[in-house]
Amino acid sequence: MAAKQVLFSDEARAKMLDGVNTLANAVKVTLGPKGRNVVLDKSFGTPTITKDGVSVAKEIELEDKFENMGAQIVKEVASKTADVAGDGTTTATVLAQALLTEGLKAVAAGMNPMDLKRGIDKATARLVEELKALSKPCSDPKSIEQVGTISANSDATVGKLIADAMAKVGKEGVITVEEGKGFEDELDVVEGMQFDRGYLSPYFATNQENMTTDLENPYILIVDKKISNIRDLLPILEGVSKSGRALLIIAEDVESEALATLVVNNMRGVVKVCAVKAPGFGDRRKAMLEDIATLTGATFVSEDLSMKLEETNMEHLGTASRVQVTKDNTTIIDGAGEKEAIAKRINVIKANIAEANSDYDREKLQERLAKLSGGVAVIKVGAVTEAEMKEKKDRVDDALHATRAAVEEGIVAGGGVALIRAQKALDGLTGENDDQNYGIALLRKAIEAPLRQIVSNAGGESSVVVNQVKANQGNYGYNAANDTYGDMVEMGILDPTKVTRSALQHAASIAGLMITTEAMIGEIKEAAPAMPMGGGMGGMPGMM
C-alpha cells in the first residue's frame, strides 16, 4: 500500500479552501445575464466556449491533491443541483464558497465547528420553508417562456421553443433536444414514447460525455422473457449485423453471460446493440410491451402467444427513426407502426379506462394512453459552428430541466431576490448557544452572495445594489441586463423554486461537512525514477 500524507486542522482546511476558491472563482464568472464565458480546452477538436456553470466545474482537476479534494467536493454541489433541478449550479457554488470562507474563519477564531453546522442547518430549514411560502405556481405559457429564457442565459428564442413544446405535448410530455441540420432552431412533434428503464450496461453508451446511447433508424426486438442464452439471438444478430443498422432489445432481463456477449460485440463494432429492461411489472408489463410493439411495428415475442425467441427472424423486428437511451429512460421517436393499428390500440385503452374499477388502474391506463397518443416534441438546435452548437444545446437542456422544475414546484423572483426576501424568516431565530447563533448569522450573510456576484459580473457596485434591494419589499430587485430596478416578476426575471431551494440545501450541506473536517488523507506522489545513463560507444578494434 502506498504511503499516505495526513494534514490536520487549520492546515487541512486552508488547503481545502484554496481548492474551493479555484473552482468557484472559475464558475462564478458565468452567473447572471452579463456573466462571462469560460473557454474549455479539449484533447481534440475545437475548444468549447460556455456559460454553463456545471460544464466549467466538471473540467477542473487540480494538481495539488488536497486542494483537489476541496474542488471535487464543491463540484459535487454543482452536479447534485444539476441532477435534481437542472439549473442553479453556479448559485450553489457561490453559496458554498461564501459559507465556507466565513465558516472557516470562525473555526480558526476558536468557535465550535459542530455548533456552527447546527446553526447553518437550522437556518437552512427555516429558509426552505420561507422559499416555499414565497413560491407562486407556474402554469401559464408566459411564465413558462420567461423561466426558459432566464435559464438559457436570457435567450428568448429558447424560452419560446420550450413553451411551445410544452403546449403541444403537455407539461408532463416527452421533450428531447438534438442537434439540427440548419442555422435556425426548429420544433417538431413526432409519434413517440418514453418509458422509465435505461440501458442494462453503461458500455452500451455511444456518447461518453452525456452517457447516452443514440441509435439512428434501429431495429427493435421486444421479448417478454429473460434472455439467458445468446444462441437464441444469433439469427437476429447476424441479420442486423449484415444490414449495418443498430438493434434495440427490450426484454424482461438479459442475464450476465448473454449481456457480456452483447457488450463485447457492441464494443468491437460487430453489431451496434443496446439492451434495456422492459417497463412495468406482471400483466401491466405485457400490456406496455404490446403498446411498444404496436408503435414500432414489431411482433411481440411471447410464449403466451406461442412464439419462441429462437424462432424469431428479421420480419419480427420493429423500427423507429431514432432511439435515445440514458441510464434511467428510453425514448423511442417516430416508430414505424401502422397508424390504423396505433389508433385501434388507443381505442382499446380508452375502453379499458371506462371499465376500470380502481383509481390506481385508471391512472396507469391513462399513463399508457398518454405515452401512446401524446407524441414526443423534438427541439432541433441550429447554429453556425460546431462549438456554438454544443454550447447552445447544453443551454437548451438546462433551460428545459429548469422549466420542468418551475412547473413542478412553482417560481420565485429571480436575480437573487428570493433569497434576500427569505432573510426576514431568520429574524428572531436563535440557536442553543452563541456559536449556533453565529452559524445562523453566517447563512444570513451568505445568501446575499448570488446577488452580489450578478452585480459584480455586470460591472456594478454590489454593496450599493444589495442595500437598495433590501430597503424595498416584495419582488423589487435589480435587472443586471439593463441596469434598472423594478418588479422582477413583471420584468420576466424568474427562478424555479426547486432550483433556488436545491442550490441552498446542497451548498449548506457541503459547507457544513467541510467546516467540520479535522483531517485530510492523501497518497504521497512517488517521484518518477531517474532515467539510466546512456552507455558510451565501445572503442572500435584496430584503432590507436
UniProtKB/Swiss-Prot annotation:
It holds the Pfam family Cpn60_TCP1. Keywords: ATP-binding, Chaperone, Cytoplasm, Isomerase, Nucleotide-binding. InterPro entries: Chaperonin_Cpn60_CS, Cpn60/GroEL, Cpn60/GroEL/TCP-1, GroEL-like_apical_dom_sf, GROEL-like_equatorial_sf, TCP-1-like_intermed_sf. The keyword Isomerase applies. One of its GO terms (cellular component) is cytoplasm. Together with its co-chaperonin GroES, plays an essential role in assisting protein folding. The GroEL-GroES system forms a nano-cage that allows encapsulation of the non-native substrate proteins and provides a physical environment optimized to promote and accelerate protein folding. This is Chaperonin GroEL. It comes from Francisella tularensis subsp. tularensis (strain SCHU S4 / Schu 4).
